[in-house]
Amino acid sequence: GYIVADQIEQDMISKDDNVLISRKAWKMEGSRMFIEVGKRVSVKDLLKGLVIQSGNDAAVALAEYVAGSEQIFVDVMNEYASVLGLRNTLFQNSTGLPDADHFTSVRDLAVLSRALIDEFPSHYDLYKEKEFTFNNIRQLNRNKLLWRDESVDGMKTGHTEAAGYCLIASAKRNDMRLVTVVAGSKSDKERFDASQRLLEYGFRFYAAQKLLEGNKELKSST
């Protein structure tokens, strides 16, 4: 989502652009938004399918539209990762599906998530939407914390046999925002319970403090 948001902000693509769906995108396995080969789908709907429905088909369709092919998009992903300082991340595909050479760390996921929240707030609004209907198929957002905790406004679930049940969650209470990353959980319930505990701990024992006012000159020591 970060790269697509950046491309939109730079006017390289538009949310209203219509993307021709390839056979590769259409036949993706795992969670899908159920796009159809040969049809055109807007970037806006593909983003919703990616963020809300965790659609692997949407991920590939967007990758192909932005870069021409998924493999070239992966190269772009790794360039962005380097710029963002994601030192323990190497992408091999656009979906996060298992690959022996595809890896990241919980810290890098937190850094990436924070960058998306800070740099593209209007795009981040998508992550709190609870459902999306496409092709008459209604799917709920897989992030159940959106229903459990009203301060939670994102972000993303994930699951593979190797990584277990994962969740990046973000919440804001008063003027303080927290981002949590849970990986390797043994069940769907476990990842949400662990994330909720981390959020409660963070909001209880930490506080945001303003050290300086913005746009004010500091006194020189000389």
Language model region names:
Residues 1-107, 114-119:
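Active-site-adjacent loops and short helices of periplasmic peptidoglycan-processing enzymes
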Residues 86-87, 98-222:
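Domain-terminus/edge residues, biased toward the C-terminal soluble/receptor-binding domains
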